[in-house]
Amino acid sequence: MRSFLSRFRQPTWLATLCFLMVTALLSACQKEDTTDYTERDEALITAYIKDNNLTGFQRQPSGLYVAITQPGTGANAQTGQAVSALYTGQTFDGKVFDSSSNNNNTPISFVLGQGQVIAGWDQGFALLNKGSKAILLIPSELAYKGASPSSSIPAHAVLRFDVEVTNIK
């Protein structure tokens, strides 16, 4: 009596087994990063504030930290308004990755609340008015999350932005 497997040609059976193993390995390698970075980001931000002797920060429910270093005038920016701002962005190790000074101090302009900028900017600039200056400490979930938009910004990076609102329309 022949065994069940002997009914199949061995090379076909072996090829099928190899195919299934390779498929399983490839799908395991493509798993999405589901790590929650909230606690890590919170610890990094609070340590950064302490280590750099920074004061005046208000933590927002989203985890964004905002310190208004110079008050402006008028009403805060509202969703749908065009905001113009000067800025410098850096990682927590002090490396500047972008700045409006790289563009002859030409302010960046965006429509608030439309997703044209990272979520930390949409939330942070809604707390600012014309002429105000602030420091935004942005957790990775409100920045680029698991993406690395450039070699200067690693995935899951917590970011600092020094910003100045030059106009609101």
Show the residue positions of the predicted features.
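Cross-family detector of peptidyl-prolyl cis-trans isomerase
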Residues: 2-169
